[in-house]
Structures are given as C-alpha cells and as structure tokens.
Amino acid sequence: MPGHKTVTIASASTRRRAIVGGTAALIAAPFVVRSGFAQSPAVNIGVIQPLSGANAQFGINCRNGIEFVADAINATGGIKALGGAKINLVVSDATSNPSTASTITEQMITQNELTAILGAFASSLTLAISEVTARADIPCLTNSFADEITGRSLESIFQVAPKASVIGRAQFNYTIAISEAAGSKIEKIAIMYEDTAYGTATSRGLRRAAKDANIEIVMDEPYPLGINDATLLISKLRASGAQAVFPLSYLNDSIFIIRTMRQQRIAIPAIGGAAGYVIPDFEKGLGEFAENVLSISPTNYDLALALTDSFRQRFGYFMVHEAIENAATLDGLVQAIERAKSAKPKAVIEVLHGARFEGGWTKAMPGGAVQFDQTGLNTLSVPIMVQWRNKELVTVWPKAVAKAPPVWHS
C-alpha cells in the first residue's frame, strides 16, 4: 500500500484507527476494544464498500448498518462461543471502480486474518471482490442484486437480497396489482435502465414479466451510469405513450429522471428499482416531486420499527434497506460463527450453507429470517413495494405487510 499513516479517532464506546492511503480517503477503520481485562482474540470482519465516488452514500449506509450491529454485539458480550471475542471491523473504500475494489480486497486479505468480508453494494463491485474472496476461500456476504452473483458456482458467496430478475419481476407484478386494485388498466409501459450489472439484470426481470402478462413495452432504453441531463430520455418517454415507467437508477440519475419528468408535467406513475429511489437523499433532492413515487425494495424500516428506530436516533435518518440488509447479514454471520464455534473461514462457510438464521436483525427482512441455499442465495427474501409519502418511505404492497394503502394516479 502506498505510504500510509495511522490516525486514531476516539469516541465514547470505541476507538478507531483509520489507515489513509493514496487511492482512497478511507482505507481501513477497524474497531479496537480496550478494557481492563484480557480479551479473546478479536474476529476480523472485512467491510468493503464504496465510500467515495458515485455510490458513496450507499456505501456509507451499508457501513453504518454494519457498525451499528457490531457495536451492539460487542457491548453485549461479543461472540459467546469464542469466549466473548469482539468483532473488529476492517473497513476499506471500494471507491466505485471494480478494478480498485478487486485490488483493495487482495490487500485486505493479505494484511489481515479475516473471517469474512461484507460488500460491496453495487453489483459490479461485488462481482469483482467475490472473485478474489473465492480464490482465498473467505466468505463474502452481500446485499447486491445481480443474478450472476450467486450464479457462478462459487461456494464462498452469499446473497441476502433477492436476485435482480426477481426484483424486476416483482416490480412489474406488484405495479399491475396496485393499478388493478385502483381500477386502472395498464397496457403500455416504459423501461429505462443504467447499463450496469444491476440495471441490466433487473430490466431483464421486468421485461420477462411484461411479456408473460402481454403488456406492450413501448420504450426499452439503456443509458450510461452518471447522466447529467435526462431530457433525451424523458422526451422519448413522452413520445412513447407509456402509462407507467420503470426507471432503474442509482441516486443522481434517479433525481435527474424524476425531476425532468415532473418539470415536463409527465404525471404517469414512476416505479423505481430500489437503489436511488429509496434513500433520504432522493426526497431531499426532489422535494415535492418525490411525493407518491413508488419503488420496489428488498425491505423497509417500517417493517421492524422496534429495531430500526434506534438506528434513526443514532444516525439521524431512517434506516435504509441497504443498512438493514447489512445489519441482518452481520447478525446471520455472527450466528454462523457461534454455531461453528470457530472464526475459520471454511468452518463458517460450511455453516452458512443451508442453515436458517432467526431472531435479531434477521427478523427485519420480509422473510422473517435468513437461509442460504447451496448457491448462497437467501431463499426467504421477498421484495416489497414502498412509496414516498410526506417525506417518509412507506411499505404499501403486498397487502399482508403494507403499512398504508398505495396511492395510484393513472
């Protein structure tokens, strides 16, 4: 690693070291637990998230969810099966570049004795880092969406969120159900998606669901991540005659798309593909234009307020889905370590496959628990539909878990 220095940051409950390198503002931030009595060796968990670049806010949210649970576990006695061993988070910035993420993963594995790695939000980043962790036989647990993540026969990858194609299909099917419940019939839709692993895979699920329902796709438009003007996309949308639009975008693009739609007085329902559509910055960036925007999501904070309210109190914003998923992932990982009675990566991998993890933060997932099959997919994960209502994100579908009925404007 190019010349680095160690910076010690103190807080009320922990002291953190941040190793700052030349390519990333934050290369590592392990928890260091100090007390007056001997401790069992700490269990090192790698956290590789995009803490800078286009996806930085998502990475920060993921890190916050992980730190929140790690702090709670450490404060209540650590990992019991290992004599109260504390969790030591080794945090690195993946930036938003897959090549950089891969290099950082190699460095982290070389320089630390790790039990597992959590990362890296964006599917393209996770695809890169999981190739490295597979070669090292270290479990990689992720909340990324792309189907390919658990479709490569890697024994060490675990995907807590639904696959993108499942999310895309639910995004479409839930929308049709909501519109029909409101007495509206959709015959034409538009799909616009960023041409990344996430956007491409999710659009595939949307496309197949529309075909199965005999709904005409009158616009099917990929675009490069990081647009600074959505005028052309929205002009095509207006000309298409679509009755609903399904945009798949990260934060900046989602704001451009919805703002341009509303400024051009295009009032058809917009149903986002999670990502940029379900974090507080979306509403902050759009104000009143965010009201009633729908989105698919792997989970939502209002499904587990007894758990998520304390996150809001600490961090000052509602617990977004990526924070919840990473909290549930770390909780499940710690349960696996407890059952394995070992922090050895291979022992943990064996337990993760096929075991059911219940209680704690796993209850915050719509499936009520987490269970990974032999491919590493969480088979209990079920998407939900959320909607922006008065600056809050509310679960509106399916009816069995809805906190309020959806608002539909055809």
Segments (PLM) and residue ranges:
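N-terminal secretory signal peptides
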Residues: 1-14, 21-29
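Extracytosolic ligand-binding ectodomains
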Residues: 2-4, 17, 34-410
